[in-house]
Amino acid sequence: MSKYWSNITKDIEPYVCGEQPKNKKIIKLNTNENPYPPSPKVLQAIKNAAKDDLRLYPDPNCDVLRKTIANYYNLSKEEVFIGNGSDEVLSLSFLTFFNPEETIVFSDISYSFYPVYANLYKLDYKLAKLREDFSIDIEDFKNARGGAVITNPNAPTGLYLSLDSIKQILEDNINKVVMVDEAYIDFGGESSVSLIKDYPNLLVIQTLSKSRSLAGMRIGFALGQKELIEGLNRIKNSFNSYTIDRISSLAAIEAIKDEEYFKECTLKVIKTRNWTINELGKIGFKIIPSKANFIFITHDTYEAEDIFIKLRDENVLVRYFNKDRISNYLRVSIGSKEEMEIFIDKIKKIINKL
């Protein structure tokens, strides 16, 4: 700790991201990345973008990308906001729509960046306790004084909340913003985007990191009625007008446009997820129903931390959370079929020795 730090810097507990190993031989199932490369059209766009106009600033409004996303979701360009990954979009959204004197609500088991944002911006928040099966009780989100944040599908559980439940939360908080974080929506859930026209308090946040294989380029976006997007732009332009560079913008456009490749990759992930769930069930694991590109697993006989350590020793990384209620669970990202076959083989050998 330095005497030059501000009080906020001294007090804040930063988010801890998943391990990014340098060893390329490690099977990486800990950060929910896509096991398949970006679309070939994306890679070609990146090559084509490497030219002398990189000396110029990019379009601060990302107009072409916004129009591409708007067309994809049948929205107007004015209903799309672009940011440097969905983490930045979420952070700016917390600052744009939530007030320090009004308590916001999000689940006790959810994306662990939410309390970091709340503490950074001095926001009061209430943790809505998930049920024993990790499902959401929507009554806990009723009449939230400051607004609400829903992760759908939830992370790290993978559970999906129906659109009817989302509608109820929106109606119960009609005078406050409800953010729906849909980072994993493309792996089996139904997006809330269709509700935007009817709910001026709905902000849907998505990313190209997961289903579009662009985690390395940091592209996220928010979708909502234009008054919400105008507010986000006011805050963004008080920090950094140029959040997306030229190359990332062009890559994102091609990723959105290549629907055939997108569907092919997401279908492979879903099929591999279902295969993995079946194989783990054969050896006694309990798996929370998942609509994401990861699964949340536990075993009545073996400790999650022990399995986590043994897998790491075998060069397989998964995510372990040493937290209340989930300390005996592992979150396992869905890799390629070949990677998951190795994972299953390793975990069988490990539990046979424990």
Curated annotation (Swiss-Prot):
Please indicate if the UniProt record lists Protease as a keyword: no
Which biological process terms from the Gene Ontology are attached to this UniProt entry? L-histidine biosynthetic process
- N6-(pyridoxal phosphate)lysine occurs at K210
**Does the keyword Amino-acid biosynthesis belong to this entry?**
yes
Q: Known EC number(s)? A: 2.6.1.9
What reaction(s) does this enzyme catalyze?
Answer: L-histidinol phosphate + 2-oxoglutarate = 3-(imidazol-4-yl)-2-oxopropyl phosphate + L-glutamate
Instruction: State which pathway it belongs to.
Output: Amino-acid biosynthesis; L-histidine biosynthesis; L-histidine from 5-phospho-alpha-D-ribose 1-diphosphate: step 7/9
| Keyword terms | Amino-acid biosynthesis, Aminotransferase, Histidine biosynthesis, Pyridoxal phosphate, Transferase
Q: Which domain of life is it from?
A: Bacteria
Q: Which cofactor does it need?
A: pyridoxal 5'-phosphate
| UniProt GO molecular function | histidinol-phosphate transaminase activity; pyridoxal phosphate binding
One Pfam assignment:
Aminotran_1_2
| Quaternary state and interactors | Homodimer.
Family, similarity comment: Belongs to the class-II pyridoxal-phosphate-dependent aminotransferase family. Histidinol-phosphate aminotransferase subfamily.
HAMAP family listed in its UniProt record: HisC_aminotrans_2 (MF_01023)
Full protein name: Histidinol-phosphate aminotransferase
Source organism of this protein record: Clostridium botulinum (strain Langeland / NCTC 10281 / Type F)
Q: What gene is it encoded by?
A: hisC
